[in-house]
Amino acid sequence: MNGQTPARHYYKKLVPSLILILNCIQFLSHPTKADPILLAFVFAVYLAFIWIIPYVASTAVSLSIFIGLWLLTDFFWAVSGQEQGAAYFLIVFLMIYAAFRLPSRLSLIFTACLIGGNILLLSSQGGSLNTIISNISIMLGLYVLFSSMRFRREARREAERNHAELAKMHVQLEHAHKELQKAHAELQEASVLSLRYAVLEERTRIARDIHDSIGHELTSVIVQLQSLPYILKSSKEDSEKVIQNVLSVARECLQEVRSVVHQMGRSESMVGLTALRGLIHQVEERSGLHVSLDTAGLSEESWPPNVSETIYRILQEALTNIIRHADASHAAAVISNDKSHLYVTITDDGQFTGSLTYGFGLTGMKERAEKAGGSLTFSAVQPSGLKIELSLPLMTTNKEQKDEQR
């Protein structure tokens, strides 16, 4: 029932039924040439029509019912002679219902047929020109009035449907946006974990070096110190040699410890470049996109952890966008620096020609760069492709180097 409540649907049938019943009583109460039984029968058919037509889904069946009522009414008009009050009322009633129930074009054609039939009947029964014009004017006016009411009602319903669909789409978009944010957060967390794993791997390597080099040398020191009391009793010269050997090994251990500590202090920054190479290798294996990395202009390889993470995530998002949207076969990343800044340029040979839409990924890249105190720009590459230029400050690195020198 088009989403209507049962009470409203019942009301829409009850009102026209009462109109028919009241008019039928009025026409029967006045003496006319029309057969009362035939008049009551025609009104009863119309009454049944009101309660049946809402359940007819087929347009063809509905049109057939309307045509049948029209022919029945014209027959009633013809056999009633000059008495055409009840018949004319029923014709107008049928026209109004057609304006509401039939499709717009069919209702217009059906109304034209009704008007044409009225003209023929009035002419055949000697109706005057003024009567014909008056009847046609009334019918046209009523048709325009009720058709406009129908159009407004349909427009309102369409607007309500569109509003409901937009609200539903808005909810779906909000859900999708939350899912994207969740996925993006998980991706960020995975990026951080990959960097941490790289740091742990580097520290494991350093621990292994300590065990293999310093551990061996300290074992040698312990053995020589354990034998020293016996050597002192036997030969003074041999004992001096042992002491010199122990001192030499101890100095080497100290130098090795300093070297390891220095490497551990730099491991979190040096891991940035290692992580980038690992990311590029992973992308090439999984997507088939060829990615080159140029570090010829890189003289400063000691990056702060926040710089390493920012570069890693921006390169990761850039390569993801290239794979998804650019239809590129090659991408290139160039990393360089000067005294105060680190520069990363990412280019591809994809389909981009100059019209850029800032989506979730590009906006996130730009915000990430700005959060790190840097900047990110996008520009077109001739003949096609996209260039991403990232600039990040290295002040934190310079400060760390000064602390190390102290």
UniProtKB/Swiss-Prot annotation:
Gene3D superfamilies: 1.20.5.1930, Histidine kinase-like ATPase, C-terminal domain. It comes from the Bacteria. The lineage of its organism: Bacteria, Bacillati, Bacillota, Bacilli, Bacillales. It is a multi-pass membrane protein. GO terms for cellular component: plasma membrane. It comes from Bacillus subtilis (strain 168). Probable member of the two-component regulatory system YxjM/YxjL. May activate YxjL by phosphorylation. InterPro entries: HATPase_C_sf, Sensor_HK_TwoCompSys, Sig_transdc_His_kin_sub3_dim/P. The modification Phosphohistidine is found at residue 211. Residues 35-36, 123-125 are extracellular. GO terms for molecular function: ATP binding; phosphorelay sensor kinase activity; protein dimerization activity; protein kinase activity. Its EC number is 2.7.13.3. Keywords: ATP-binding, Cell membrane, Kinase, Membrane, Nucleotide-binding, Phosphoprotein, Transferase, Transmembrane, Transmembrane helix, Two-component regulatory system. This is Sensor histidine kinase YxjM. Its main location: membrane. The keyword Oxidoreductase does not apply. SUPFAM superfamilies: ATPase domain of HSP90 chaperone/DNA topoisomerase II/histidine kinase (SSF55874).
